[in-house]
């Protein structure tokens, strides 16, 4: 989950990039939208034409809200990144935490590619706690700053329990095959 400030796929040869304006770009959890960026100007013009013809554009107000967020994107992302680094350092050494998943950690399987392709390691953190579902529930209930919700990239500090929230429609077996355990939590 990188904003366009942290990773630019066109620099690595992508022809088109799709960004969610709902998340980091807007940053205030009050817009649903997206943007398609083309490497070639002609393709971008064709996309803009068809978006207009088909009515696939955001409302003027939603566009204004996204622009408002874009103006503060750099400042917000810098704070997100710094906060994530501090949280990861705390979680990595905590006895109640059994695993931390963050590309900024040298042992993360995506660390090398993230270091090559991104300007920072982002602000999305997943981790597992001791005690399975009961441990995850107790952890969430003890929080004072984070709210339990499914989202990311906004000004709110959020925690999610993927097994019972974002991935609840998957069977427990499929969840485990995807690395989603009852002890897994996600911070954003």
Name each model-derived stretch.
Residues 1-95, 101:
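Conserved PLP-enzyme active-site core in the AAT-like
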Residues 96-185:
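Conserved C-terminal alpha-helix-loop-beta "cap" of PLP-dependent enzymes
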């Amino acid at each position: 989950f990188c904003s366009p400030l942290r990773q630019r796929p066109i620099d690595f040869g992508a022809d088109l990039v799709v960004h969610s304006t709902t998340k980091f770009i807007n940053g205030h959890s009050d817009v649903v939208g997206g943007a398609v960026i083309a490497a070639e100007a002609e393709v971008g013009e064709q996309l803009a034409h068809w978006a207009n013809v088909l009515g696939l554009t955001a409302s003027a107000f939603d566009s204004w809200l996204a622009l408002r967020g874009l103006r503060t994107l750099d400042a917000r992302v810098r704070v997100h990144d710094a906060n994530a680094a501090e949280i990861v350092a705390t979680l990595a050494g905590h006895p109640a935490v059994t695993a931390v998943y963050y590309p900024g950690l040298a042992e993360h399987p995506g660390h090398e590619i993230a270091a090559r392709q991104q300007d920072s390691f982002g602000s999305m953190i997943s981790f597992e706690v001791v005690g399975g579902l009961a441990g995850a529930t107790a952890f969430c209930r003890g929080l004072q700053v984070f709210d339990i919700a499914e989202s990311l990239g906004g000004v709110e500090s959020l925690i999610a329990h993927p097994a019972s929230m974002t991935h609840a429609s998957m069977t427990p077996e499929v969840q485990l095959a995807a690395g989603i355990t009852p002890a897994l939590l996600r911070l954003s």
